[in-house]
Swiss-Prot record:
Ca(2+) 4 binds at D141, D143, D145, K147, E152. The keyword Repeat applies. The gene is CanB. Calcineurin is a calcium-binding and calmodulin-binding protein found in all cells from yeast to mammals, and a calcium-dependent, calmodulin-stimulated protein phosphatase. Ca(2+) 3 binds at D100, D102, D104, Y106, E111. This is Calcineurin subunit B type 1. The keyword Metal-binding applies. PANTHER family: PROTEIN PHOSPATASE 3 REGULATORY SUBUNIT B ALPHA ISOFORM TYPE 1 (PTHR45942).
């Protein structure tokens, strides 16, 4: 599969050629059926994602064309956001997209509830979770439109070091 060598280097600006080769090897190991793309099951074999309750959202974001699989180009572009050389804004945008499930540029009350539900499972009653969601929206929603924009999201989490935790070794 010569796919990884035909990628334009500007697309992978957070990785050098050596890292791309290593990622290519890793991708081929994960691609158990040699289809040239990772299914959800193949993607789930990544140790970094196995215990992550948001794995489906990560896959949805990596799967840029929405065909249900992650090809090598999508894999590189997705993982690139977690490079140590990735910038803070890109990492914050990725984190925002985890919550922005319908990709409309806003985190609605319902979206925040769904994502938090993925994280807490049944550890909280839905009424308790809804209270947390409502308080979070009230706190972050500076223009009082009932939803959280990317700028509002950044003003809340941008001062944290979350972007420093969004790193994978290649």
């Amino acid at each position: 599969m010569g796919n990884e060598t035909s990628l334009p280097m500007d697309m992978c600006s957070n990785f050098d050629a050596d890292e791309i080769r290593r990622l290519g090897k890793r991708f081929r190991k994960l691609d158990l059926d040699n289809s040239g793309a990772l299914s959800i099951d193949e993607f789930m074999s990544l140790p970094e994602l196995q215990q992550n309750p948001l794995v489906q959202r990560v896959i949805d974001i990596f799967d840029a064309d929405g065909n249900g699989e992650v090809d090598f180009k999508e894999f590189i572009q997705g993982v690139s956001q977690f490079s140590v050389r990735g910038d803070k804004l890109s990492k914050l945008r990725f984190a925002f997209r985890i919550y922005d499930m319908d990709n409309d540029g806003y985190i609605s009350n319902g979206e925040l509830f769904q994502v938090l539900k993925m994280m807490v499972g049944n550890n909280l009653k839905d009424t308790q979770l809804q209270q947390i969601v409502d308080k979070t929206i009230c706190f972050a929603d500076k223009d009082e439109d009932g939803k959280i924009s990317f700028d509002e999201f950044c003003s809340v989490v941008g001062n944290t070091d979350i972007h420093k935790k969004m790193v994978v070794d290649v």
